[in-house]
């Protein structure tokens, strides 16, 4: 249900509280998932005019789960705070003395409901952490992470019995990884949603039993970061090693991700250096180039009155990954009507060369390759 539809059904006196929740309702680590409202109902009589819904179910993303709490207002007395029913979490009993925004409910503040929800989620986190005491191994995982502020302050935990018949215990840890994305080139981040939220990496680690014999990690990247690093298939985290623990595994994933970010940043600056060197070496032979991401360059060259184009595609992880050179005749066509071309990746290359050395080596390779390309164009293409 869209925020607009939700607000149109809410009692007008309660609408400011609900608007703040559905429009600004980010709680917890996952900034890409907002609070949602469903199951709108009214406690008013059927004679009450206009929109009168004053109770609903609030969906809260938490540690890879979705908490579903019922919130019950009284539209007849909208100045009163709501009641809460915590659904399947019947054992969750919040400490009223820690719910300051509920005890000091301020109906003139549109954010008062959102503030109470945040306080409740904090207490819910403490409740879940306390449940880990059923497993000494999982409690060890929690305590060692908690001792490191960079992890302990950015962690959500969901624990419980996976199987009520066997009593088997399981838990999921969700951690916001302390990785700096601020230096990723802007052009890689612009193709995103209108409101992409925070750039974040979340690591979910599920323990399917109390002794940690089955552990399944999974990495979640916010949309802009996933796009900047080359898509969902570009980053594979290692399996959780047998006998390992989170305090050893999490830094490994952080380092892996940090290295990927550095490769992308380095690739951007190296591509810019590469294209600058080609502009210097080939001058007026440069037809066009990508002046934003420095990912493409096209040259118009000639050899013994044979003119040809060279399209150079520089990959995201350049210079680790080698550029592709595509030679294209300006005279010859294929049967499908396209200019005859050949792509080459088997040419002298070293990621350790600077841009100037790469340009010099490329020029030498062009001279050595163009005779056979010309011959192939005449043999396989049509004028």
Curated annotation (Swiss-Prot):
CDD domains: BRE (cd23664)
Region entry UEV-like 2, spans: 275-364
Region (UEV-like 1): 30-147
Keywords: Apoptosis, Cell cycle, Cell division, Chromatin regulator, Cytoplasm, DNA damage, DNA repair, Mitosis, Nucleus, Repeat, Ubl conjugation pathway
Main localization (coarse): cytoplasm
InterPro entries: BRE
Annotated localization: Cytoplasm; Nucleus
Family affiliation: Belongs to the BABAM2 family.
Function per UniProt: Component of the BRCA1-A complex, a complex that specifically recognizes 'Lys-63'-linked ubiquitinated histones H2A and H2AX at DNA lesions sites, leading to target the brca1-bard1 heterodimer to sites of DNA damage at double-strand breaks (DSBs). The BRCA1-A complex also possesses deubiquitinase activity that specifically removes 'Lys-63'-linked ubiquitin on histones H2A and H2AX.
Quaternary context: Component of the ARISC complex, at least composed of uimc1/rap80, abraxas1, brcc3/brcc36, babam2 and babam1/nba1. Component of the BRCA1-A complex, at least composed of brca1, bard1, uimc1/rap80, abraxas1, brcc3/brcc36, babam2 and babam1/nba1. In the BRCA1-A complex, interacts directly with abraxas1, brcc3/brcc36 and babam1/nba1. Binds polyubiquitin. Component of the BRISC complex, at least composed of abraxas2, brcc3/brcc36, babam2 and babam1/nba1.
UniProt name for this protein: BRISC and BRCA1-A complex member 2
Species assigned in the record: Xenopus tropicalis
Gene name for this UniProt entry: babam2
């Amino acid at each position: 249900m869209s925020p607009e539809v939700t607000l149109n059904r809410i009692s007008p006196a309660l609408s400011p509280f609900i608007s703040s929740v559905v429009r600004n309702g980010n709680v917890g680590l996952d900034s890409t998932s907002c609070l949602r409202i469903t199951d709108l109902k009214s406690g008013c009589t059927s004679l009450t005019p206009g929109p009168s819904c004053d109770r609903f179910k609030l969906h809260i993303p938490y540690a890879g789960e979705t908490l579903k709490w019922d919130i019950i207002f009284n539209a007849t007395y909208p100045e009163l705070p709501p009641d809460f029913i915590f659904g399947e979490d019947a054992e969750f009993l919040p400490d009223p003395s820690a719910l300051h925004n509920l005890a000091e409910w301020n109906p003139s503040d549109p954010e008062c409901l959102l503030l109470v929800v945040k306080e409740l989620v904090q207490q819910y986190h403490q409740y879940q952490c306390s449940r880990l005491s059923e497993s000494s191994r999982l409690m060890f995982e929690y305590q060692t992470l908690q001792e490191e502020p960079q992890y302990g302050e950015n962690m959500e935990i969901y624990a419980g019995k996976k199987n009520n018949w066997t009593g088997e215990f399981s838990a999921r840890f969700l951690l916001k990884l302390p990785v700096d994305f601020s230096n990723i080139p802007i052009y890689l981040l612009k193709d995103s949603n209108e409101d992409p939220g925070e750039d974040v990496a979340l690591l979910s680690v599920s323990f399917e039993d109390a002794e940690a014999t089955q552990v399944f990690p999974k990495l979640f990247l916010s949309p802009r970061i996933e796009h900047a690093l080359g898509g969902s298939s570009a980053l594979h985290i290692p399996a959780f090693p047998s006998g390992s623990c989170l305090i050893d595994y999490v830094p490994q994933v952080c380092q892996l991700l940090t290295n990927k970010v550095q490769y992308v940043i380095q690739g951007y600056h190296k591509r810019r250096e590469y294209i600058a060197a080609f502009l210097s070496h080939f001058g007026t032979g440069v037809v066009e180039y990508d002046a934003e991401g420095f990912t493409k360059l096209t040259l118009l060259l000639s050899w013994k009155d044979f003119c040809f184009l060279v399209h150079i595609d520089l990959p995201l992880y350049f210079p680790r990954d080698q550029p592709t050179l595509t030679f294209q005749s300006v005279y010859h066509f294929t049967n499908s009507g396209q200019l005859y071309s050949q792509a080459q990746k088997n040419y002298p290359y070293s990621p350790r060369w600077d841009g100037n050395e790469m340009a010099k080596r490329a020029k030498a390779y062009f001279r050595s390759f163009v005779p056979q390309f010309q011959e192939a164009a005449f043999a396989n293409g049509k004028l």
